[in-house]
Curated annotation (Swiss-Prot):
Domain of life: Eukaryota
Natural source organism: Capsicum annuum (Capsicum pepper)
Listed GO MF terms: lactoperoxidase activity; metal ion binding
Enzyme Commission code: 1.11.1.7
Protein name: Peroxidase 5
Names of required cofactors: heme b; Ca(2+)
Compartments, as annotated in UniProt: Secreted
Primary residence: secreted
Amino acid sequence: MGDISPLTGTNGQIR
């Protein structure tokens, strides 16, 4: 449910 994304920070899902 949570992945490391450089766009959202540390926890965010790309929808």
